[in-house]
C-alpha cells in the first residue's frame, strides 16, 4: 500500500516506465500519457470498453477510412449503430435515425454491420481479458468488468500496470483501441472508462468519489434514464450532490427501491461483485402445462407471457436477437422446433410474440401439446435492435408503449403491469 499523503506515483502508459512525481512527460520515451493517482496501485476493479468498436474494426480493415467519418448502420430507414469519433464531432450519435445522421454529416461513409466479423474480433479481445483474470463479466460484445484482485503474483505487477499493458497489446495485436476505467466498484469503474475516450485510462479512487460525483447530473447513475430523470427534475433534483444531502428513508419513500440505489450510488457505494457467466448463445423461456393443450387461444395465452419474459432477460443482459425460435413438445414427448430470422434484431416482446405467433399458427392442427417455449438466438449488441419501421407506423407506438411498461416494471416490480395478453391468464408451470 502507498501513503495517500505522498505525491502520487505513476507510470507512462506507452513504455510503462515508472515516473517521477512531478514530470509532465515520460523521462524515457517523451510521451505525455502519464498515469498518476494516489490510489493507483491499490485499485483492482476495472471496466474495459472498446472505442467505437464496429467503426474501429472497419477502419482497421480499410486504412482508406482512417481520416473519414464512418457510420455503421442500416439503410435510410434504419438507425446508427456506431459512429466513429470523427462522425461524432459532426453530431452523429448511436441510435440516431440514419436520415438525421446523414443530414448532420453528409460526407460520412455508411457501412452495413458485419456482425460475424465484430463477434469474432470481440471474442479475441475477450480471450485477452481472460488471460488477465478469470473474473470477467461481459456486458456486451465489446465491454466487460474485470476483477484483478490477487493477480499481482501472476503478472508481477499491480492491476493498473497489467491493464495498461493489456491496452497496448490489444492495439498492437488486434488493431483497435480500448478505454479503461479503474476504481474500487463497478459503478465508478464504468464511469471512469468514459472520461477520456478514445484510448483513455481513468482512475476514480475511494477518497475522491463523493466529491467527484457531486456536480455530475443524476443521469450518470446506473438506471436513471430520461423518464426517471424527468421525475427527479420535477422534484427539483438535477445533480448527484443533491441526492448526497438526502436521507435514504426519504429517497425510498419517494422512489421506492430505486431510492436506495440513488442513496448508495450517489455516495459511491456499490457492493456488486464481478459475476462470471458463460457467453449466452440464446435467451429463451418455456412452460409445461398441467393439462395438454390443443386450442390456439390457449397456447397463445402462454406465448405472450413467455415472450415478455424473454424480452425482460434480453434487456437486463444488454442483448438482442435476430432469430426467433418456437419450441413445442407434443403429448407423446416429440419436440417440434421452428425458427424465423428477422430482418433486424429485436429485444421487444411484441416482435418476439408476433413472430412466434406466425410460427405457432402453422403447428395448430389438433395436436395436443404439453410444453411451449419461445426464444431468440443469434445474439447481438442491443444498439442494432428494432430500427423505426416506416411500413408499419404502429410498430413505433407499440415499442414506445413497451418501453413505458418496462420503466414501470423496473420501478415497481415485474408483476406491477400486465398487458392485455397476460392479464387474468393462468401461469401454470411458470
Curated annotation (Swiss-Prot):
The active site is at 143. Mg(2+) binds at residues 49, 142. The keyword Thylakoid does not apply. The keyword DNA damage applies. Its main location: cytoplasm. It holds the Pfam family IMS_C. Residues 45-225 form the UmuC domain. It comes from the Bacteria. It is found in: Cytoplasm. It catalyses: DNA(n) + a 2'-deoxyribonucleoside 5'-triphosphate = DNA(n+1) + diphosphate. HAMAP family: DNApol_IV. Poorly processive, error-prone DNA polymerase involved in untargeted mutagenesis. Copies undamaged DNA at stalled replication forks, which arise in vivo from mismatched or misaligned primer ends. These misaligned primers can be extended by PolIV. Exhibits no 3'-5' exonuclease (proofreading) activity. May be involved in translesional synthesis, in conjunction with the beta clamp from PolIII. This is DNA polymerase IV 1. It comes from Rhizobium meliloti (strain 1021) (Ensifer meliloti). The lineage of its organism: Bacteria, Pseudomonadati, Pseudomonadota, Alphaproteobacteria, Hyphomicrobiales. The gene is dinB1.
Amino acid at each position: 500500500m502507498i501513503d495517500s499523503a505522498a505525491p502520487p506515483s505513476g507510470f507512462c502508459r506507452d513504455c510503462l516506465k515508472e515516473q517521477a512525481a512531478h514530470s509532465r512527460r515520460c523521462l524515457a520515451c517523451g510521451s505525455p500519457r502519464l498515469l498518476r493517482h494516489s490510489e493507483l496501485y491499490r485499485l483492482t476493479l476495472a471496466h474495459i470498453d472498446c472505442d467505437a468498436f464496429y467503426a474501429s474494426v472497419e477502419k482497421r480493415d480499410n486504412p482508406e477510412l482512417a481520416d473519414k467519418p464512418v457510420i455503421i448502420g442500416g439503410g435510410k430507414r434504419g438507425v446508427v449503430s456506431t459512429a466513429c469519433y470523427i462522425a461524432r464531432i459532426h453530431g452523429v450519435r448511436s441510435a440516431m435515425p440514419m436520415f438525421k445522421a446523414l443530414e448532420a454529416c453528409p460526407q460520412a461513409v455508411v457501412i452495413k454491420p458485419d456482425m460475424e466479423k465484430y463477434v469474432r474480433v470481440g471474442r479475441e479481445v475477450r480471450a485477452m481479458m481472460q488471460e488477465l483474470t478469470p473474473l470477467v463479466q461481459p456486458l456486451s460484445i465489446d465491454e466487460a468488468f474485470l476483477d484483478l484482485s490477487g493477480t499481482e503474483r501472476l503478472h508481477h505487477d499491480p492491476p493498473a500496470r497489467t491493464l495498461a499493458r493489456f491496452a497496448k497489446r490489444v492495439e498492437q495485436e488486434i488493431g483497435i483501441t480500448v478505454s479503461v476505467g479503474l476504481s474500487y466498484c463497478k459503478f465508478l469503474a464504468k464511469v471512469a472508462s468514459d472520461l477520456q475516450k478514445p484510448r483513455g485510462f481513468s482512475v476514480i479512487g475511494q477518497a475522491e468519489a463523493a466529491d467527484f460525483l457531486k456536480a455530475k447530473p443524476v443521469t450518470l447513475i446506473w438506471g436513471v434514464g430520461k423518464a426517471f430523470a424527468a421525475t427527479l427534475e420535477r422534484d427539483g433534483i438535477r445533480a448527484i450532490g443533491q441526492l448526497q444531502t438526502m436521507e435514504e428513508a426519504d429517497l425510498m419513500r419517494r422512489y421506492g427501491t430505486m431510492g436506495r440505489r440513488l442513496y448508495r450510488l450517489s455516495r459511491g457505494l456499490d457492493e456488486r461483485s464481478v459475476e462470471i457467466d458463460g457467453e449466452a448463445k440464446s435467451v429463451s423461456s418455456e412452460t409445461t402445462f398441467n393439462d395438454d393443450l390443443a386450442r390456439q387461444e390457449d397456447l397463445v395465452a402462454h406465448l405472450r407471457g413467455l415472450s415478455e419474459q424473454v424480452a425482460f432477460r434480453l434487456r437486463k443482459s444488454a442483448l438482442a436477437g435476430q432469430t426467433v425460435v418456437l419450441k413445442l413438445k407434443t403429448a407423446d414427448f416429440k419436440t417440434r422446433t421452428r425458427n424465423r430470422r428477422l430482418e433486424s434484431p429485436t429485444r421487444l416482446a411484441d416482435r418476439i410474440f408476433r413472430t412466434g405467433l406466425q410460427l405457432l399458427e402453422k403447428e395448430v392442427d389438433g395436436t395436443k401439446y404439453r410444453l411451449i417455449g419461445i426464444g431468440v438466438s443469434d445474439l447481438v449488441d442491443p444498439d442494432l435492435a428494432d430500427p423505426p419501421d416506416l411500413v408499419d407506423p404502429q410498430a413505433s407506438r407499440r415499442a414506445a408503449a413497451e418501453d413505458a411498461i418496462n420503466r414501470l416494471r423496473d420501478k415497481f416490480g415485474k408483476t406491477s403491469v400486465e398487458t392485455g395478453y397476460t392479464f387474468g391468464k393462468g401461469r401454470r408451470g411458470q
